[in-house]
Amino acid sequence: MGVTELGKLIGKDIRREVKLENLAGKCIALDAYNSLYQFLASIRQPDGTPLMDRVGRITSHLSGLFYRTINLMEAGIKPVYVFDGKPPEFKLAEIEERRKVKEKAMEEVLKAIKEGRKEDVAKYMKRAVFLTSDMVEDAKKLLTYMGVPWVQAPSEGEAQAAHMAKRGHCWAVGSQDYDSLLFGSPRLVRNLAVSPRRKIGEEVIELSPEIIELDAVLKSLRLKNREQLIDLAILLGTDYNPDGVPGVGPQKALKLVWEFGGLEKMLETVLRGVYFPVDPLEIKKFFLNPPVTDEYSTDIKKPDEQKLIDFLVREHDFSEDRVLKAVERLKRAQTKYKISSLDSFF
């Protein structure tokens, strides 16, 4: 879900639109779960249901991951996918709430299928998308066969991705969410894992990658440091307190940060007595010091062609002709990189 309300304060003047080719030579730490959910929500059959193999296993995420990653590499981008680990304890209640929402949406999907309402199938299916552990493992397997690096985060994927960007091992974090800025990434690139065209109502709009720099956000919002940005996000709502503070919208939240300087003083004064399901200072502490690891590789390796074909074509019923052509594209794209045959860690 991410900090969507915060995005309303980030104006067009801060969002620098670029073409994929403008990111050539850059290493991008991609939020794997965010990307996979995008693929699951957008890659569907004409009846609104996801792509599936002959035994009914969902493959929309594999299709999106395979072809979109090749597109990124053809543009000269070096992708590194970062997978979520164990969430903080105070996120578990929100995760359970999301699970219930997805279950309810799936009930509506089944009802719409039974009644032949194709538009409703597509609508509710987007709300019902979920990732199983098997789907995640298949995504990791696919990336390994492609020779594309992936990292297992100890906790939040965006925290790990931001850590890699802060260390200079990746140029930016790639995600639709803004959380990586709170975790300290110097820059965020949005719209990398989505289709360049998106239908909103009857209108089809073009989506270009956009770069958002942390320093530019702080300057535009007249914030002294990242801590104040975190305070602002907590007032508006994060993954850990999605409702934020009742009655506090983007502009009011910004004024509170300007006036009181920080969350600590607000809790002693204007927010005294306000109920928080999760201690906001614990949330702030987590954004400032999340669990991360230095054990990771960003090396591109040679693809294992046979395993790729066996996995996608034999196991998951992808078109052999399309996969063979895509593998050739992948091999050509990889000539842009220094290929490693051994693991190398920072």
UniProtKB/Swiss-Prot annotation:
Co-factor requirement: Mg(2+)
Residues holding Mg(2+) 1: D31, D84, E156, E158
EC number: 3.1.-.-
Region feature N-domain, mapped onto this chain: 1-102
Keywords: DNA damage, DNA repair, DNA replication, Endonuclease, Exonuclease, Hydrolase, Magnesium, Metal-binding, Nuclease
Region (I-domain) location: 120-261
Hydrolase listed as a keyword: yes
Assembly and interaction partners: Interacts with PCNA. PCNA stimulates the nuclease activity without altering cleavage specificity.
Task of the protein: Structure-specific nuclease with 5'-flap endonuclease and 5'-3' exonuclease activities involved in DNA replication and repair. During DNA replication, cleaves the 5'-overhanging flap structure that is generated by displacement synthesis when DNA polymerase encounters the 5'-end of a downstream Okazaki fragment. Binds the unpaired 3'-DNA end and kinks the DNA to facilitate 5' cleavage specificity. Cleaves one nucleotide into the double-stranded DNA from the junction in flap DNA, leaving a nick for ligation. Also involved in the base excision repair (BER) pathway.
Protein name from the UniProt record: Flap endonuclease 1
Organism annotation: Pyrobaculum islandicum (strain DSM 4184 / JCM 9189 / GEO3)
Gene symbol of the encoding locus: fen
